[in-house]
Amino acid sequence: MQNRPKSVLTPARLGTSGVVRNTLEDPWVRFQIELEFVQSLGNPDYLTFLAQQGCFDKPEFINYLSYLQYWKSPSYSRFITYPFCLHMLDLLQSPDFRREVAHESVTRFIDDQMLLHWKNYLRKRAEMVNKHVQSLDAMATPGPGPSS
């Protein structure tokens, strides 16, 4: 039998005293859990589920969403794979948005907007980069010098 390294995703790990400790006390596990949760906020269907379950009516949950704002800082946001989740985290700070996201029509609208963004992003970005390069080329091209 091989000795495999213990995974960081095990439900519980041993503390320095050999006693099993709560996984939320482990900073690495907590980091992973919070990262996964923040990224799940980019899923409009999940937001609708949370709203329909009444999570957005609980002050503790609202405070947790506020606490998670630290993920917007560059030292943490560099770990984010789906940056749209940070925009959704911002929107979730609004009571109006939390109330409206419970409706399927709002979820479909958000889904549609995300798909349109993904569909057109690369083309629009390429156009913007080309315009920028052209403007840099125009600035770098020296004009006629003084006449002698």
Curated annotation (Swiss-Prot):
Domain of life: Eukaryota
Keyword list, A-Z: Activator, Nucleus, Transcription, Transcription regulation
GO MF term list: transcription coregulator activity
Similarity comment: family membership: Belongs to the Mediator complex subunit 31 family.
Cross-referenced InterPro entries: Med31_sf (IPR038089), Mediator_Med31 (IPR008831)
Organism the protein comes from: Taenia solium (Pork tapeworm)
Annotated compartments: Nucleus
Name of the molecule in the record: Mediator of RNA polymerase II transcription subunit 31
Subunit structure: Component of the Mediator complex.
GO cellular component, one term: mediator complex
Nucleus keyword on record: yes
GO biological process: regulation of DNA-templated transcription
Role summary: Component of the Mediator complex, a coactivator involved in the regulated transcription of nearly all RNA polymerase II-dependent genes. Mediator functions as a bridge to convey information from gene-specific regulatory proteins to the basal RNA polymerase II transcription machinery. Mediator is recruited to promoters by direct interactions with regulatory proteins and serves as a scaffold for the assembly of a functional preinitiation complex with RNA polymerase II and the general transcription factors.
Keyword ATP-binding: no
Name of one Pfam family that matches: Med31
